[in-house]
């Protein structure tokens, strides 16, 4: 899988565009926050959040993606710290982040089991998790995202993962047009998540 992402991000164009995800842009993200972006790819969300005046780190296991993140950050006059790590093995620092972001961060079951408890532990008290992911219904649209059901999310699955850990969660299933580069393009079924520790 790592080779797949390195090949995709080795293309000259930004696979998912250079603009941040619409859900992320619609949030009231403050300034001066320590922010972690998971499976951030080419850095479009990290760069946007850094442009608001935040200290942003992103983790991805594609070196090609992180190189494009650095290039995009330079083009936008901001700094983003990139860490090349496999999220199935990473150990996140506890109570370190004000905000953790996961945009279309889709993982196999064993990675989900590893990473989501760590995300909760890594947030400071009062910290926030923001996510937009493809719903399982996305398979019928064929406009982006994984083509395997087990890599997609169901609302009930996310509720089960997050309810026992977060003090407040809001999960909304929506149908919207996603236009993010050439690989996420068209009508889609997504889940948008806001969770507070």
What are these regions (language model features)?
Residues 113-125:
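A short glycine-rich, Lys/Arg-flanked "PGG" loop and its adjoining helix->strand segment in the class I
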Residues 88-99:
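A short acidic, Gly/Pro-enriched loop at the edge of an enzyme's catalytic core
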Residues 138-158, 182-184, 190:
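Acceptor-substrate binding/catalytic loop of class I
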Residues 1-30, 137:
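Conserved class I S-adenosyl-L-methionine
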Residues 126-134:
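Conserved beta-strand signature within the Rossmann-like core of class I S-adenosyl-L-methionine
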Residues 76-88:
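Conserved SAM-binding strand-loop segment of SAM-dependent methyltransferases
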Residues 98-113:
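A short SAM/SAH-binding and catalytic strip from SAM-dependent methyltransferases
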Residues 62-64:
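Conserved SAM/SAH-binding beta-strand->alpha-helix loop
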């Amino acid at each position: 899988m790592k080779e797949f992402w390195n090949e995709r991000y080795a293309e000259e164009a930004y696979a998912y565009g250079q603009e941040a995800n619409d859900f992320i842009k619609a949030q009231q993200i403050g300034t001066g926050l320590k922010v972690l972006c998971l499976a951030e790819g080419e850095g479009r969300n990290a760069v946007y959040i850094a442009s608001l005046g935040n200290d942003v780190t992103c983790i991805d296991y594609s070196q090609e993606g992180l190189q494009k993140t650095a290039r995009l950050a330079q083009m936008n006059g901001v700094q983003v710290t990139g860490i090349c790590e496999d999220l199935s093995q990473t150990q996140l620092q506890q109570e370190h982040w004000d905000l953790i972001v996961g945009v279309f961060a889709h993982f196999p079951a064993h990675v989900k089991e590893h990473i989501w408890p760590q995300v909760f532990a890594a947030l400071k008290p009062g910290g926030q998790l923001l996510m937009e992911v493809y719903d399982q219904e996305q398979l019928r649209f064929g406009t982006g995202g994984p083509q395997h059901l087990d890599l997609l999310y169901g609302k009930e699955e996310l509720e089960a993962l997050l309810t026992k850990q977060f003090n407040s969660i809001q999960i909304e299933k929506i149908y919207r047009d996603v236009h993010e580069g050439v690989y996420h393009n068209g009508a889609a079924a997504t889940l948008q998540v806001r969770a507070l520790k």
